Amino acid sequence: MRSDMIKKGLERTPHRALLKGTGVPQSEMDKPFIGVATSFTDLIPGHVGMRDLERFIEKGIHTGGGYAFFFGIPGVCDGISMGHKGMHYSLPTRELIADMVESVAEAHRLDGLVLLTNCDKITPGMLMAAARLDIPCIVVTAGPMMSGRGEAGRKYSFVTDTFEAMARYKAGVIDEKELKVCEDNACPGMGSCQGLFTANTMAILTETLGMSLPRCGTALAVSALKRRIAFASGERIVDLVRNNVTPRSILTRAAFENAIRVDLALGGSSNTVLHLLAIAHEAGVELPLETFDILAKETPQLASMNPAGEYFMEDLDAAGGVAGVLMQLGDKIKDNPTVMGMTTLQLAASIANVDEAVIHPLTDPVKKEGGIAILFGNLAPKGAVVKQSGVSEAMMKFIGTARCFNSEEAAMAALMDGNIKAGDLVVIRYEGPKGGPGMREMLAPTAALMGLGLGDSVALITDGRFSGGTRGPCIGHISPEAAEGGPIALVEDGDRIELDIPDRRLELLVDEQTLSERRARWQAPEPKIKTGWLARYAKVVTSAYTGAVMSAD
């Protein structure tokens, strides 16, 4: 065992003394040492219930014959950090988390890891660490929140309803009482945000990849099932250590293709493009950005999930969960091993019934194509991402007049002041991985567009990214980004921009001579943040089309 390096032999007498100083009995020294990387914090609804899950994981580890050690990992809530300086830190924490898990596991020669996670960047950070370390690992996602409840049984979604309510109140569509009812009822308790936003999409994809136990991706945070899954995960990690089942034997090209197909079938968050690219990078799996679009054209959308649709995570779980989606996708899914021991196809075959009102069959899809599309053109030579499942038919093709803003705040002010009109195309730039830095989510302006009733007449493009709660004609991840001199930096107010999602094009309708003249005049702006972690991050982070991973060069 790896842990023998810190507990066996004469030379390790000081190491054993330190371990005994923590309370480890001599009788436990021959057992596998299992680290539990926990992202508990009482700052985030998605993580506030983890203390309970920690207990069940620990019980499972000891039942399985291992010895558990806990260590902490930071958790940032994208909702709380949204719309201000805090959002600069969200995506970079993914890299910090991967580095921290790696550091603790390697420094203490842990035999295996249980990765307790839930929210947006924490789950991919944990998976990146698992792929990088390639020691036995199992992921426990803490589970989604129940939908909120309002008057007359109305269901509330935190992300969609609260952010859009701000603009609706500003526009006079709702009054202060309705706003307060939404605020008070949108989050009824612990768990990740209720729809198919980034956290829940990543939990589902973690199960699809084979890195968590069946039902883990959809079992509600408040459920007894989630606790049983936590216990079983603790027990299972000891078996994985004894049999040396490591993440890279599970995270194959087939696993990533399966995850992309499930994402497309459910209409998941566009952030998953960044995260799957980054996890594949750590696993040594070649996964070009174009793969998402190739699979989207042959994988129909099978579910209508909130925010663009009517169903919540509780509905998906009851309808069959991940296994139900795999079953409905049929021969589009490739067989692959999982941490459970059963293969992906065995998991799909394990479910008896699927509620086809929620998870449609291939013969009756919600939409003919998957939920995400990759666009290219002279405005995005290396690609851009759109969650096409959230775009109305009226906006699948659009030509608009550019309104340029060099920050999210400037665009948000223009929206809330009523300065954006039908036919405009909002351009938010210098918000990419380097330029932001941190590639902030543009949920506030996209929610304002919808709340102001502009979702069928105004589009938005950015080198930043979007929340899983974003819906509407919003194109992100434009690469190269403005801070690297990408074409989005050359757009001027009044330019015409063509968006054609069916044809996968994003074009700036300006002649090449004019663009060459603008390019010659362009100068990179001063960094927005010059000190601290983010200043270092901006120097080494790569482009969105590579997953915004940090360069080792």
From Swiss-Prot:
Binding of Mg(2+), residues: 78, 120-121, 441
Transmembrane annotation, as ranges: none
Biological process annotations from GO: isoleucine biosynthetic process; L-valine biosynthetic process
Catalytic activity: (2R)-2,3-dihydroxy-3-methylbutanoate = 3-methyl-2-oxobutanoate + H2O; (2R,3R)-2,3-dihydroxy-3-methylpentanoate = (S)-3-methyl-2-oxopentanoate + H2O
Active site: 467 (proton acceptor)
Lineage top rank: taxon: Bacteria
Protein keywords: 2Fe-2S, Amino-acid biosynthesis, Branched-chain amino acid biosynthesis, Iron, Iron-sulfur, Lyase, Magnesium, Metal-binding
Annotated residues for binding of [2Fe-2S] cluster: 119, 193
Known cofactor(s): [2Fe-2S] cluster; Mg(2+)
Pfam families per UniProt: ILV_EDD_C, ILVD_EDD_N
Cofactor descriptive note: Binds 1 [2Fe-2S] cluster per subunit. This cluster acts as a Lewis acid cofactor.
GO cellular component assignments: cytosol
E.C. numbers: 4.2.1.9
Assembly and binders: Homodimer.
Family as reported in the entry's similarity comment: Belongs to the IlvD/Edd family.
Stated name of the protein: Dihydroxy-acid dehydratase
Native organism: Geotalea uraniireducens (strain Rf4)
